[in-house]
Amino acid sequence: MKEQENSWNNGNIDDFMNTYWKNDSLIFIGKSGINYGWDKTIKNYKNSYKTKEQMGTLKFKNIICNPINDSTFIVTGKWSLKRNDSIGNLSGFYTLLWIKKLTGWKITYDHTS
């Protein structure tokens, strides 16, 4: 989660997306509904946050990690984006399913509101 914060706050969506499972079966649920696939998810991020100013400063809080087994965790918490007054701040909550893959720990399911 700290890697994601750092990548986001450096304006690097590509690095931010490295924690997501690069697969068509990735599920991302957000304000626009359910999206499937890593390609669709990164495209949506890049369309929504075209500049570093729009990205703002990301902070994750109240992170709770619940193990399902040795290779699966459910992570919940609050996210916030601090941005300048002309754009406005954003915040919400998330639930992530992290699964240990051959390439390391990856987010396979993201429900962000």
Show the residue positions of the predicted features.
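A solvent-exposed, acidic/Ser-Thr-rich amphipathic alpha-helical stretch
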Residues: 13-67
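Solvent-exposed loop/turn segments at secondary-structure junctions
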Residues: 33-35, 81-82, 113
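Hydrophobic/aromatic beta-strand elements that line small-molecule binding cavities or substrate pockets
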Residues: 45-46, 61-66, 79-81, 93-99
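Short, cysteine-centered beta-strand-loop-beta hairpins and adjacent loop/turn segments enriched
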Residues: 53, 81-89
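A short hydrophobic beta-strand element
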Residues: 71-79
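Short beta-strand edge/turn micro-motifs at domain boundaries
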Residues: 91-113
